[in-house]
Every structure is written in C-alpha cells, then in structure tokens.
Amino acid sequence: MTYKSLSIYVRELLGYLIIGLLFPWLWLQGIYLKKVVLRLPTPGDTPFGVLKGNGRTLEILGLGESSMSGVGIAKHSETLTGLTAIRLNQLMDRQVNWKVLAKNGLTIKTLNQLIKEQPSTDTDLILVSIGGNDVFKLTPPWVWGRDLVRCVKLLARGGRKPLILFSPVPCV
C-alpha cells in the first residue's frame, strides 16, 4: 500500500468517525428545530375559483403538498394553481375553473390515495407538486419512482388525457 492510498484511506476513516461522533448532536438538533420552527397556515378561503371568459371551459387541478396548498399566503388565488388559472384566462379569454387539492405533509403514496378517493373529472391541466415530504421521510428513490408512475396512471384513468405538469422536487 502506498503512502498516497493510505492517506486517502485514513481521511475517509476520519470522515466516518467525525460523522459518527456528531450524529447524536445533529439528531437532537433536528428534533429541536422540528419543535420550534414556525408552522405557517394555509389560506382560509375556498380552494377553487371560476374565471369568466368565452369559448370552451378550461379545467385546472392543483395537487400536492404544502407548496401547492399555499402555506404562508393569504388566498388560494395566489397559489400556483390560482395564478396559472388567472394567466391562462387572460391569455386565452376562456372561462377557467380551477381547484386546489393539496395538504401539508402529503407524500406520493398519500397523494395517490387522495386521487383514488376523488371522482373522475374532465380536467384539462393538472399541476402536481410532490416530493419534499418523501425526502424528509426517507422514501427510497425506487419506491418514489414506482409511486410516481402510479400517480400518472391514476390521473389518466378512464381514458382521460389531461396535460400533467410536475414541479421539481423542492430543495430540502
């Protein structure tokens, strides 16, 4: 074994040792932060709206976790779904019906359950924001990917062909 390879081995070993020694402190710090971090409310108004326009009605549905539910903002019309509906109404001069179906703490698995419980509708555009809570709950990537495929299949059930847009997984 050369001096250089021994040096790399020792540095790697020291890294694991430091992580092992710091882990209990980091774990306790995480528990403390979870207790003291401010919990922001979701908007208190109705999570749907209708924007008047001409021509065929455009149906928009927003699904997901806290980022989609509007945590920390005053009105659902200021959520990603509400703002998308407003902009499409302005650009296309069509009536837009929009609805937000989102909850704090949802994972891809619980989102799939929520989708199964909803009646099938003729939605034209579905916006999905999911993944942050899966990261916190340490969902394995292969399980997340499998459940994401199930999500798309559930959204397209009954022969529907909505445009489904996924936002990137939030940086956590």
Task: Set out the residue ranges of the language-model regions.
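N-terminal secretory targeting modules
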Residues: 1-61, 91, 121
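Extracellular glycan-modifying ectodomains
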Residues: 2-12, 16, 103-104, 110-114, ...
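Catalytic nucleophile-elbow at a beta strand-turn-alpha helix junction centered on a G-D-S/GDSL motif
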Residues: 56-74
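Conserved beta-strand elements of the Class I
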Residues: 59-61, 99, 126-128
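Short hydrophobic segments within beta-strands
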Residues: 63-64, 101, 167
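Surface-exposed cleft-lining segments at the edges of enzyme active sites
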Residues: 70, 100-108, 132-143
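Membrane-embedded segments
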Residues: 72-124
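Alpha-helical cap/lid subdomain in secreted, periplasmic
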Residues: 116-172
